Amino acid sequence: NKTVHSTTERALMCPSCGHVIYPRIVPAVIVGICNDDKILVTKYRTGFAHYALVAGFTEIGETLEETVQREGLEETGLRVKNIRYYKSQPWGIVDDILAGFYCDVDGETDIHMDESELKLAEWKTREELELQPDDFSLTNEMMLMFKNGRM
C-alpha cells in the first residue's frame, strides 16, 4: 500500500500494518575557528565559489563537539579548543540540520589545507572578511557576527 502522512507526528505511515517511517535527519557542523582577531575562511575545491567556514557531517557515534574537532583537523590541520555552540539552522533543501560553533585555535596556527576538499584556507581579520550579499545562511550569519565583533 501507499504510505500516508501521519496525523499525529511528522512521519509516514502504512495504513495496512501501521508501520511508521520517520524522516532521516543528517547533522552537520559549521565551525568558526578564531585566532584572536582573525577567523579561518575556506573555499571549496568545487561548487560554491564564496567564502565559507570549516564544515562537515557528524559521523555515527560522534558528538557535535567531536565533529568540530575532527573537521578542523581534517580540513586545515588545526587543533581547536573552547568550543562554543552558536545556533542551528535546518537546511530545507535536503535533510540536514546545521549546528554552528565558534572555537579557538589550540596551539599551532599554520594551516595545512586538505587540497582534495578545499582550494583556499586562510586567516582573515574582521576588516578583510567579505560577506555574501543577501545571504541568510548560518555560515554568512556567523561570519557577520565575527566581522561585527559580536563573537
Model-assigned labels for residue ranges:
Residues 8-53, 57, 79-85, 103-107:
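N-terminal strand-loop-strand
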Residues 63-64:
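N-terminal phosphate-binding loop and adjacent alpha-helix
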Residues 48-51, 114-151:
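Nudix hydrolase/Nudix homology domain
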Residues 89-112:
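Active-site-adjacent beta-strand/loop module that shapes the phosphate/pyrophosphate-binding cleft
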Residues 68, 72:
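Hydrophobic alpha-helical positions that pack around
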Residues 1-2, 18:
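Cys/His-coordinated zinc-binding microdomains
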